[in-house]
Regions:
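Non-heme Fe(II)/2-oxoglutarate
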Residues: 1-75
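Catalytic core of non-heme Fe(II) oxygenases with the double-stranded beta-helix
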Residues: 59-165
Length: 165
């Protein structure tokens, strides 16, 4: 499988994106998640599920992200879904995911570009092959085994940088 890392803006209809943004503001986040086994940098995390039923049970509007992925990319199957988040001062590790393809959806519609918090994808020599700034209603995708990292959030930002993976 050879997938070029890409991002897509306006992934969902505007009103659905707004509902997802509001739904995620009500989530009870859990801190202390490792993206790298025994890593020192932790972040906020909530597991959603391993199948479509579990995703829908978690939140109807969040399931619409998977439904749109399925419509646009029918060749992929859901392995699991979860929420990640971090704030200023938390710097996630460069890491790889398991599975075939990773999709990351940015739900915060009020996010300002100067706050940072995007995602960078790297080649094996740690050169950036894609940097996608954080923008509400944007989704990025890349091969799951690709090195990638959520980017730091500016100290001027007092918001939680959230994403659906």
């Amino acid at each position: 499988m050879n997938i070029e890392p890409k991002y897509y803006d306006n992934f969902l209809e505007e009103h659905i994106a707004q509902l997802i943004d509001m739904e995620l503001r009500e989530v009870s986040w859990q801190y202390d998640y490792d993206s790298v086994k025994n890593g020192v940098n932790k972040h906020w995390h909530v597991f959603i599920g391993h199948d479509e039923g579990e995703i829908e049970d978690f939140g109807y509007h969040i399931s619409m992200v998977w439904n749109q992925i399925k419509n646009k990319f029918p060749e992929y199957k859901l392995e699991r879904a979860y929420l990640n988040a971090h704030t200023h001062g938390l710097e996630p590790h460069i890491h790889r995911d398991d599975g075939d393809v990773t999709f990351i959806y940015y739900p915060r519609m009020d996010w300002k570009p100067q706050w940072g918090g995007g995602t960078s994808v790297f080649d094996e020599n740690y050169n950036v092959t894609l940097h996608a700034g954080y923008k509400g209603n944007r989704i990025i995708n890349f091969e799951a085994h690709s090195l990638h990292q959520a980017q730091p959030v500016s100290r001027e930002c007092y918001q939680l940088r959230t994403c659906i993976v």
